[in-house]
Amino acid sequence: YKHRILYYGPENVSEISSQLERLHANKTNLKQIPNKKEFIEGTMDKPMVYVVDYDMKQAEVMMLSKGDKVNIDDVSKYCQIKFHNEYFGGGMSSIVFQEMRESKALAYSVYSTYTLPRDTNASHYLMSYIGTQADKLSEAMIGMTELLDVMPEAESNMKNAKEAIEQKIRTERLTKSKVLSEYEKAQKLGINYDVRKDLYEAVQDFDMNSLKDFHNSHISSGTRVVMVLGSKEDLDLEILKEYGEIKHLTLEDVFGY
């Protein structure tokens, strides 16, 4: 099949090219790469709750909402997303982790992140995950919903988020195959430079208003779809009905076999 060759190393381009001419076989009559299967993103026009019955004591919950298509010309949004994720739901010092696990003990695992698509045909998604005991499902879902609806303001957390982003960029080194993989990811988005430069410069000027504006525009709004994995014997369906129409899925529905 037709292909490309990526190289990272000490040799210059002309030396590598001459070696490839000599050593690389199968350079002619190459087949076209088959078109990849396109998976169409579903619409989220009404609240739904998808439930999969699985024999387990815990409940796994994902609250999902769909955002806009990625816009490669709006690098400022990329910076806002990275800052909000770090502050709100991306790590152990985030608001979501501290509120849901540390303060209220409502989850053994929890996060909330606004995704960064890997190509220009994909949309942003807000993904908020809760791993909790089945008997804490109601409290956990209420707690997460409250955080999504109204973002708590904590100056110390905001400062830590800025410092974490700056420190990561200062110390992170892209070397060897990582250079190639990062280049490929950027190319898929139509970007021809290292956007971490923009992030490092932008985060200096971000403040609590920046976080609130992004949260109100992209997190608080939007139709939410809830996905729940757990034992149907332990899940309270009356509680789940409050979040949308319930649809039970079989393992065949999920995996296709």
Q: Model segments located where?
A:
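M16 family metallopeptidases and their MPP-like homologs
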Residues: K2-Y8, A59-V70, F97-D213, S221-L229
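An aromatic/glycine/proline-enriched structural segment found at the starts
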Residues: H3-N71, V228-Y257
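A generic secondary-structure signal for well-formed alpha-helical elements
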Residues: E15, L23-K31, G91, K104, ...
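Short beta-alpha junctions and helix-cap segments that line functional grooves
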Residues: N35-K36, K212-H215
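Short proline/glycine-enriched turn/loop segments at secondary-structure junctions
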Residues: V51, F214-S217
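Active/ligand-binding-proximal structured segments within catalytic/core domains
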Residues: M63, D73-G89, S94-Q98
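Solvent-exposed, non-transmembrane alpha-helical starts
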Residues: I72-K77, L137-A140, L237
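A C-terminal, polar beta->alpha supersecondary segment
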Residues: S93-S94, V179, D253-Y257
